[in-house]
C-alpha cells in the first residue's frame, strides 16, 4: 500500500451510507476507528468482502451481532450490477456494467494458466485516439473506487470467489478498458491498492498492469503512489504518426513520454526493469518495415518487451487491419534488434470485446459525436 493516503472523490451512496467498496484498507481502518471499533475489524470485513465476495453483513459470522447491526445502519457493500453478458466462442466474456445511468464494459479472458480481467477506469475517454472505439464516443466522468474495484468484485462473484471455489478466479488485472487511468488517479490508485492487498484480492504487483497513452505528469505521480506493472500505448515510431493517431502526443511527445517511463522503471520493482510497449498494427499507417527499424532505434534506451496488436475494427473507423504478412515482417525486424516481440492473440472480437472495441454507453460531455457530425464525419459506434 502506498504511504500516501489517497482519498476517493466520493464514498457515500444516495441514501447517505458509506459504500465500503470505496475504501482501501487504511481508509477502512479509519472508518472502524470512527465507529469506536478496533482496526482489526476492518481486516475481518475486507476478507469477507473480497475473499468470499460477500455483500451481506449478516453472513459475516465472526463479526458480533451488535457491530453487524451498526454496519447495516451506516454502511453497505454495493458493487455495480451487470446488465448484459456476452460470451465469445473463444471463452471470453464481456459484461456491460451499469454505473449510474450509463454503462462501461469489463472483459474476462480465461486461458489455461491464467484468467485476466480487463477493467475500465472512466465512462468514455477524453484522449481521442483515432483507432479506438471508446475514444470516438467522448468523455463523461471518472469512475469511483467502488465502480472500479466493483468490476473485479462482480467478475469474481460470477466466476467464483477464491474462498468459495478454492481457486483464484482472476489471476491478472489490466487497467486497459474504457478510459485513461492516469486521468483518474485519485480513484484508480486506491482501487489497485485493494487489488494488491492481502485482505483484498491479494494479487501480485506484477499481475496488476496499468496502461497509459502518455499523461506524463500523472505518470510521475504514479511512481510515488503505488508500484504496479506498466504498459504504454505507443502505437507509432515517430512523432509525426503519433500526433495523428494519439493526439495527446502533441502535448507530451514520444521523447518526453519515454523519459517519464524510464523514471517510473527506476522506482518500480513490479516491472522487473522493463515496460510493455503496446503497438496497434494499422495497415499502411505504422506497419512498414521502415517503421519497425524506426521503432527499434527509438526504443534502444528503454528496456522493454513489445506487444504487436492486430487492430480490431469498429464501424466508421478510417483504418484497416494489417495483414499477417506485414505483421510478421514487422515482428522479425524488431527481433533482429534483440527485442522480445509478441503478436497478441485477438480474443473476443466476435462480441466486440477485443482491444480497442469497448464501447459501453456514454453520455458525451465533450460533445465529440456532435462535433464530428458537424464536420461531416460519419459516426456509427456500436453500443452494447
Curated annotation (Swiss-Prot):
Disulfide bridge positions per record: 118-355
E.C. numbers: 2.1.1.192
Pfam family, one: RlmN_N
Gene Ontology biological-process entries: rRNA base methylation; tRNA methylation
Reactions performed catalytically: adenosine(2503) in 23S rRNA + 2 reduced [2Fe-2S]-[ferredoxin] + 2 S-adenosyl-L-methionine = 2-methyladenosine(2503) in 23S rRNA + 5'-deoxyadenosine + L-methionine + 2 oxidized [2Fe-2S]-[ferredoxin] + S-adenosyl-L-homocysteine; adenosine(37) in tRNA + 2 reduced [2Fe-2S]-[ferredoxin] + 2 S-adenosyl-L-methionine = 2-methyladenosine(37) in tRNA + 5'-deoxyadenosine + L-methionine + 2 oxidized [2Fe-2S]-[ferredoxin] + S-adenosyl-L-homocysteine
Domain Radical SAM core: 111-350
Cofactor(s) needed by this chain: [4Fe-4S] cluster
Binding sites annotated in the UniProt record for S-adenosyl-L-methionine: 179-180, 211, 233-235, 312
Transmembrane segments: none
GO CC, alphabetical: cytoplasm
Tree of life domain: Bacteria
Subcellular location: Cytoplasm
Active site: 105 (proton acceptor), 355 (s-methylcysteine intermediate)
Binding sites annotated in the UniProt record for [4Fe-4S] cluster: 125, 129, 132
Keywords: 4Fe-4S, Cytoplasm, Disulfide bond, Iron, Iron-sulfur, Metal-binding, Methyltransferase, rRNA processing, S-adenosyl-L-methionine, Transferase, tRNA processing
GO MF annotations in UniProt: 4 iron, 4 sulfur cluster binding; metal ion binding; rRNA (adenine(2503)-C2-)-methyltransferase activity; rRNA binding; tRNA (adenine(37)-C2)-methyltransferase activity; tRNA binding
InterPro entries to which the protein is assigned, alphabetical: Aldolase_TIM (IPR013785), Methyltransferase_A (IPR040072), RlmN_N (IPR048641), RNA_MTrfase_RlmN (IPR027492), rRNA_lsu_MTrfase_RlmN/Cfr (IPR004383), rSAM (IPR007197)
HAMAP family: RNA_methyltr_RlmN (MF_01849)
Record's miscellaneous remark: Reaction proceeds by a ping-pong mechanism involving intermediate methylation of a conserved cysteine residue.
The protein's role, per its UniProt record: Specifically methylates position 2 of adenine 2503 in 23S rRNA and position 2 of adenine 37 in tRNAs. m2A2503 modification seems to play a crucial role in the proofreading step occurring at the peptidyl transferase center and thus would serve to optimize ribosomal fidelity.
Record family assignment: Belongs to the radical SAM superfamily. RlmN family.
Annotated protein name in UniProt: Dual-specificity RNA methyltransferase RlmN
Organism: Escherichia coli O6:H1 (strain CFT073 / ATCC 700928 / UPEC)
Organism taxonomic ancestry: Bacteria, Pseudomonadati, Pseudomonadota, Gammaproteobacteria, Enterobacterales
Amino acid at each position: 500500500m502506498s504511504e500516501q493516503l489517497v482519498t476517493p472523490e466520493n464514498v457515500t451512496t444516495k441514501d447517505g451510507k458509506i459504500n465500503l467498496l470505496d475504501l482501501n484498507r487504511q481508509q477502512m481502518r479509519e472508518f472502524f476507528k470512527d465507529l469506536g471499533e478496533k482496526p482489526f475489524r476492518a481486516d475481518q470485513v475486507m476478507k469477507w468482502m473480497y475473499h468470499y465476495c460477500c455483500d451481506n453483513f449478516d453472513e459475516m459470522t465472526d463479526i458480533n451481532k451488535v457491530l453487524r447491526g451498526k454496519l447495516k445502519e451506516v454502511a453497505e457493500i454495493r458493487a455495480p450490477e451487470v446488465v448484459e453478458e456476452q460470451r465469445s466462442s473463444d471463452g471470453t466474456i464481456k459484461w456491460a456494467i451499469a454505473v449510474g445511468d450509463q454503462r462501461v464494459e469489463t472483459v474476462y479472458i480465461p486461458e489455461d494458466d491464467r484468467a485476466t480481467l480487463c477493467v475500465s477506469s472512466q465512462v468514455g475517454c477524453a484522449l481521442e485516439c483515432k483507432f479506438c472505439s471508446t475514444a470516438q464516443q467522448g468523455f463523461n466522468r471518472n469512475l469511483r473506487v467502488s465502480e472500479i474495484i466493483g468490476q473485479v468484485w462482480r467478475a469474481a462473484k460470477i466466476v467464483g470467489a477464491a474462498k468459495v471455489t478454492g481457486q483464484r478466479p482472476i489471476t491478472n488485472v489490466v487497467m486497459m478498458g474504457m478510459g485513461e487511468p492516469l486521468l483518474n488517479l485519485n480513484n484508480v490508485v486506491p482501487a489497485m491498492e485493494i487489488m494488491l492487498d492481502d485482505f483484498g484480492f491479494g494479487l501480485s504487483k506484477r499481475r496488476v498492469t496499468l496502461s497509459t497513452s502518455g499523461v506524463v505528469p500523472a505518470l510521475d505521480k504514479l511512481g510515488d503512489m503505488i508500484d504496479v506493472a506498466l504498459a504504454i500505448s505507443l502505437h507509432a515510431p515517430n512523432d509525426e504518426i503519433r500526433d495523428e493517431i494519439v493526439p495527446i502526443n502533441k502535448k507530451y511527445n514520444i521523447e518526453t513520454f519515454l523519459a517519464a517511463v524510464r523514471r517510473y522503471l527506476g522506482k518500480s520493482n513490479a516491472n522487473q526493469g522493463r515496460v510493455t510497449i503496446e503497438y496497434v498494427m494499422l495497415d499502411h499507417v505504422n506497419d512498414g518495415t521502415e517503421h519497425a527499424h524506426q521503432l527499434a532505434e527509438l526504443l534502444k534506451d528503454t528496456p522493454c518487451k513489445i506487444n504487436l496488436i492486430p487492430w480490431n475494427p469498429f464501424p466508421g473507423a478510417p483504418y484497416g487491419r494489417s495483414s499477417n504478412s506485414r505483421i510478421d515482417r514487422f515482428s522479425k525486424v524488431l527481433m533482429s534488434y534483440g527485442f522480445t516481440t509478441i503478436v497478441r492473440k485477438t480474443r473476443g472480437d466476435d462480441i466486440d470485446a477485443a482491444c480497442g472495441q469497448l464501447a459501453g454507453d456514454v453520455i458525451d460531455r465533450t460533445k465529440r459525436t456532435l462535433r464530428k457530425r458537424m464536420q461531416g464525419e460519419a459516426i456509427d459506434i456500436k453500443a452494447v
